[in-house]
Swiss-Prot record:
Note: Toxic segment of the protein is located in the N-terminus.
General function of this protein: Promotes colloidosmotic lysis by binding to the midgut epithelial cells of mosquitos.
Stretches that traverse the bilayer: none
Originating gene: cry11Aa
Biological-process GO terms, alphabetical: sporulation resulting in formation of a cellular spore; symbiont-mediated killing of host cell
GO molecular function: toxin activity
Protein name in the entry: Pesticidal crystal protein Cry11Aa
Source species taxonomy: Bacteria, Bacillati, Bacillota, Bacilli, Bacillales
Top-level taxon: Bacteria
Record-stated family: Belongs to the delta endotoxin family.
InterPro entries in the record: Pest_crys, Pest_crys_dom_I, Pest_crys_N_sf
Keywords: Sporulation, Toxin, Virulence
């Protein structure tokens, strides 16, 4: 249902940055009014930075009228979303910190706006302000209240990094020597790393705590971070450049059904991969394994959802994705416990006494919901009703996807639970097993083709994943179509055309994507390929650069190669030395035209290939995103510090 009382802010379409919705249901309401203007400005600024003016703009958005109104709104919105409230004493402390930051910010901002100001004085005010923000930041890392404080911490970091970039670009105009500028470049790079590390510490702490209570609570918190936090963490690293596009492809999640706890290792090891499904395919069909049991007269008949089997296009028959999700054509079997290629579910049934129920005692159905004509579900109505006769046992489900009624409960009316988000569509539907251990102790060396199978006695939940509309084009066309009107494109690593067998899904939300690809030990090349096509009217003589974001914890002697592949017309775009670096780094290719690559028409299908030769034991590397940008629009304004 819409809440017309919310003054939602429309996001400029060209930013492609879904950061708000106007529904009071489901969990992620109310609308993201507080952060939307900041996100919109950052998306514009990263495309074209307003030198020496960006800090002033961000300051006015975070502290409009020299008041902490935006930060207060962030706090109250987040408190509502995740049901966590700061004490009044803590709120008073934060308000005092806001006043201190506002005071020194206003002094600096007002001074540099004066005509004919003295650069040496501006330098002093700048250093005072930078030091004040650094000194006060720990107040926004509140132990046991990480859920609320992480959103406040994020905006204070954004303010500081914007200040540093303006100072770097201002240079002598603000009284800085080249040595000063060099020190600010070093500080900026250090703080991007430091702030992201501290942010992820808060996220991991709170997410792990909430998941131990309930996976639903954990997903609600993750939704908040996917909108209020992680896109800004991605913006920090993009502030090094001018001309790139800030785009979030993070999904939102809705959980319906019996609450189950999971630990953080279970999330990273299996649950996240089950939720994600086939990462580079669209959802086409959903099968719900449903049972109806007749019980003694004093216990109502029950409907149970025993399992959810999503089918993607093209179908692999998998319920989830670990590794690259393939079930055959393995190059070799791994004997080191690293290769987990497939997750399948087998189902059996139990009565309230946890005794097996024979199939003849069950009215069991597989209910299938096909995809609608437009290829994408936009909403769902999924509900469950609990019996009072037997604690925590479900006795009614109602499932409707789009306009398709999948299951109409036999237990009477169930109130609607409308699941939808402006700018999002349903890309994945799954369920998390309840009553089974997800902390596997299998000897992986004995598993045929390294396949894990498990039993799921009582699922009784449904988890719906909503992807932002900026991903629809890829999932419908299976290629990345380029238009001459856009200066920059973002290609998430998971939107691949092909990937080598030795690849794994890694949860990296601070990259503003649903995950990265991890390449692990293999005797052959590690490779991911991305399909590229040109829209009609594309100028194939325009010069572009390709930027790949990777993380290489251990040195790769063979380095990383970037190539274009087009019907045997292969061209090396770049070959990079991959020294050990635990942080994300960007490799930038030399400029090229699509004429150079032999891609001259919209009918030509080409591939960008990112690869490395065989990895030894202990070696691995990660691929997060690709950025394609016009050479004329792209500038590296702050050189990264490479280890």
């Amino acid at each position: 249902m819409e809440d017309s009382s919310l003054d939602t802010l429309s996001i400029v379409n060209e930013t492609d940055f879904p950061l708000y919705n106007n529904y009071t249901e489901p969990t992620i309401a109310p609308a993201l009014i507080a952060v939307a203007p900041i996100a919109q400005y950052l998306a514009t600024a990263i495309g074209k930075w307003a030198a020496k003016a960006a800090f002033s703009k961000v300051l006015s958005l975070i502290f409009p009228g020299s008041q902490p109104a935006t930060m207060e709104k962030v706090r109250t919105e987040v408190e509502t979303l995740i049901n966590q409230k700061l004490s009044q004493d803590r709120v008073n402390i934060l308000n005092a910190e806001y006043r201190g930051i506002i005071e020194v910010s206003d002094v600096f901002d007002a001074y540099i706006k004066q005509p004919g100001f003295t650069p040496a004085t501006a330098k002093g005010y700048f250093l005072n302000l930078s030091g004040a923000i650094i000194q006060r930041l720990p107040q926004f890392e509140v132990q046991t209240y990480e859920g609320v404080s992480i959103a406040l911490f994020t905006q204070m970091c954004t303010l500081h990094l914007t200040l540093l970039k303006d100072g770097i670009l201002a240079g002598s105009a603000w009284g800085f020597t080249q040595a000063d500028v060099d020190s600010f470049i070093k500080l900026f790079n250090q703080k991007v790393l430091d702030y992201r590390t501290r942010l992820m510490r808060m996220y991991t702490e709170e997410f792990g705590r909430l998941c131990k209570v309930s996976l639903k609570d954990g997903l609600t918190f993750r939704n908040m971070c996917n909108l209020y936090v992680f896109p800004f963490a991605e913006a920090w690293s993009l502030m090094r450049y001018e001309g790139l596009k800030l785009q979030s492809s993070l999904s939102l999640w809705d959980y319906v059904g019996v609450s189950i706890p999971v630990n953080y290792n279970e999330w990273g090891g299996l649950v996240y991969k089950l939720l994600m499904g086939e990462v580079n395919q669209r959802l086409t069909t959903v099968k719900f394994n449903y049972s109806f049991t007749n019980e003694p007269a004093d216990i109502p008949a029950r409907e149970n959802i025993r399992g959810v089997h999503p089918i993607y296009d093209p179908s692999s028959g998998l319920t989830g994705w670990i590794g690259n999700g393939r079930t055959n054509n393995f190059n070799f079997a791994d004997n080191n416990g690293n290769e987990i290629m497939e997750v399948r579910t087998q189902t059996f049934y139990q009565n309230p006494n946890n005794e097996p129920i024979a199939p003849r005692d069950i009215i069991n159905q597989i209910l299938t919901a096909p995809a609608p004509a437009d290829l994408f579900f936009k909403n769902a109505d999924i509900n469950v009703k609990f019996t009072q006769w037997f604690q925590s046992t479900l006795y009614g489900w109602n499932i409707k996807l789009g306009t398709q009624t999948v299951l109409s409960s036999r237990t009477g009316t169930i109130p609607p639970n409308y699941l939808a988000y402006d700018g999002y569509y349903i890309r994945a539907i799954s369920a998390c097993p309840r009553g089974v251990s997800l902390a596997y102790n299998h000897d992986l060396t004995t598993l045929t083709y390294n396949r894990i199978e498990y039993d799921s006695p009582t699922t009784e939940n449904i988890i719906v994943g909503f992807a932002p509309d900026n991903t629809k084009d890829f999932y419908s066309k299976k290629s990345h179509y380029l238009s001459e009107t856009n200066d920059s494109y973002v290609i998430p690593a998971l939107q691949f055309a092909e990937v080598s067998d030795r690849s794994f899904l890694e949860d990296t939300p601070d990259q503003a994507t649903d995950g990265s690809i991890k390449f692990a030990r293999t005797f052959i090349s590690n490779e991911a390929k991305y399909s590229i096509r040109l829209n009609t009217g594309f100028n194939t003589a325009t010069r572009y650069k390709l930027i790949i974001r990777v993380r290489v914890p251990y040195r790769l002697p063979a380095g990383i190669r970037v190539q274009s592949q087009n019907s045997g017309n292969n061209r090396m775009l770049g070959s990079f030395t991959a020294n050990a670096n635990p942080e994300w780094v960007d490799f930038v290719t030399d400029a090229f035209t699509f004429n150079d690559l032999g891609i001259t028409t919209s009918s030509t299908n080409a591939l960008f290939s990112i690869s490395s030769d065989s990895l030894n034991s202990g070696e691995e590397w990660y691929l997060s995103q690709l950025f394609l940008v016009k050479e004329s629009a792209f500038t590296t304004q702050i050189n990264p510090l490479l280890k």
